[in-house]
C-alpha cells in the first residue's frame, strides 16, 4: 500500500508551525485531522482543515482522495477562527 504525505500548517499561531504527516492512502481523513490536531495540541472536534486557497476539505473521504484533489499543503484552523469576521 502506498503512502501520501501532507504538510499541515497551524494557521492560528503567528509562527506558522507545521508538521509533515505520512499516512497510507486508504486512511480516513478524519483520522488525519484528529492526529494533526493532537500534534498541535488543539481540539480536533473544533478544528477544520483547509487548502492554502481557503477551500474547506470534507473529512469524510480517504487521505488518498484529499491528496489527489487538493495536494499536500494544507492548513489546520481551530474553530474559533472558522467563519469569524
Curated annotation (Swiss-Prot):
UFM1 precursor is cleaved by UFSP1, promoting its maturation: processing of the C-terminal Ser-Cys dipeptide is required to expose its C-terminal conserved Gly residue. It holds the Pfam family Ufm1. Residues 84-85 form a propeptide. GO terms for cellular component: cytoplasm; endoplasmic reticulum; nucleus. Transmembrane segments: none annotated. The keyword ATP-binding does not apply. CDD domains: Ubl_UFM1 (cd01766). It is found in: Nucleus; Cytoplasm. The keyword Glycoprotein does not apply. Interacts with UBA5. Interacts with UFC1. PANTHER family: UBIQUITIN-FOLD MODIFIER 1. Belongs to the UFM1 family. This is Ubiquitin-fold modifier 1. It comes from Rattus norvegicus (Rat).
Amino acid at each position: 500500500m502506498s503512502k501520501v504525505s501532507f504538510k499541515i500548517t497551524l494557521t492560528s499561531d503567528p509562527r506558522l508551525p507545521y508538521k509533515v504527516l505520512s499516512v497510507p492512502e486508504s486512511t480516513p481523513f478524519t483520522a488525519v485531522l484528529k492526529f494533526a490536531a493532537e500534534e498541535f495540541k488543539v481540539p480536533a472536534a473544533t478544528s477544520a482543515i483547509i487548502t492554502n486557497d481557503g477551500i474547506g476539505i470534507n473529512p469524510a473521504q480517504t487521505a488518498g482522495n484529499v491528496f489527489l484533489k487538493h495536494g499536500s499543503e494544507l492548513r489546520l484552523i481551530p474553530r474559533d477562527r472558522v467563519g469569524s469576521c
